[in-house]
């Protein structure tokens, strides 16, 4: 997606969203509402790698595909 990438980290069993720049307050709130938490270790917003996580990522980022 423009401004970042979605990573399926199978080693950590996490779906991670990595932004090129810090997301604004509204975007961070959307991530939190969709179950994502900030991971300083990976520098990514992440949640457990599931089918629902992929759906939530698209919803949080406003992606339709």
Indicate residue ranges for each PLM-predicted region.
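Accessory DNA-engaging acidic/polar modules
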Residues: 1-65
